[in-house]
Swiss-Prot record:
Function in brief: May be involved in protection from oxidative damage.
Bias-annotated ranges (Basic and acidic residues): 7-58
Keywords for the protein's UniProt record, in alphabetical order: Mitochondrion
Protein name: Oxidation resistance protein 1
UniProt source species: Candida albicans (strain SC5314 / ATCC MYA-2876)
Single GO cellular component term: mitochondrion
Principal location listed in the UniProt entry: mitochondrion
Amino acid sequence: MSFLFRRSIEQPRVNEKETNKEVKDEPQHQQQEKEDDNSKQEELLSDSVNEKPKEQPKPVKRRGTFFGNLLGNGSKNSSSASLNSSHSSVSSSSKFPPLGPLTLTGYKESTHHRLLDSELANNIRNLIPARFQLFDNWELVYSLEQHGISLNTLYRNSNPEHQLRLLKKQKAAEKGFADSIVKNMVVGDTSRPRYSFEPKRSQSYVLVIKDNHNNKFGAYLSENLKPMEHRRYYGNGECFLWKCEKYDPSKLDHAVDKRATQEIRFKAFMYTGINDNIIYSNHDFIAIGSSNGQNGLFIDKSLLSGVSYSCDTFGNEILNSSPQNAKFGSFKIKGLEVWRIGTLE
């Protein structure tokens, strides 16, 4: 019984000879196909193992355009270039040296009423264009006390050609008579009125007025005052009006000294761009700023009186002291000066 049971659970053994015979009986082309498939799979596996990671393509460098190179962008991104330029401009502006001390020349020793001092001049200097801030010497060209009360004299002294003519005469006098004779023999006498002196550099001017109540006010002018034959305004947006205002510091919350009774502060009124009525002058008056027939600063031909209105050109307040809610302020001129900023040659 045990023998029969063992025979029943055993699996039938496959005859090795028969299997080998069956394999041999398969067609040869099928065996060849299997071998080819196996070899291809081995090659794919070996390639996948030995395959190196693909390198990412390098970005293509674009050549900058001609206008881009002029602007300094080159092949860089415009946004990054603008950021770099802005940072460089900020850093360069912060590296500017401080302005040198200001020198005021032209006062005579006998002049008693000097309207412009260093504090007021520096307040004006901080607001003028940077190219004129570099000049540390301001020259007095007209003074009511030194040159007399005359509008024509004011126009003549403010003319840069007249100033240059005086400068050349002064230099010739300093060099001596013999040197001037030799120069006239070589190049001719250039001091005669028929020669026209063209200034090589531009200048700007500061007008300072002091009235009978000791108020100081005036204007910064981009051009010299001159008589205009036709009603035509001149000057540019660099001009502005200014005044020195008296106030009571004890009424301020942040006042340092509550016992102080009166102080003076500088106020400027810049060009608004609403209109171009900046400067107009003729043989009858000088007007700076105008709207609706009212001038920010008006001086009559006598140089003894004037009036100030609030005008749209500068958006200014009344320059001289006036009652509250007044529409204009009239004044009597006690002193008047014109200063030149910039060199003549």
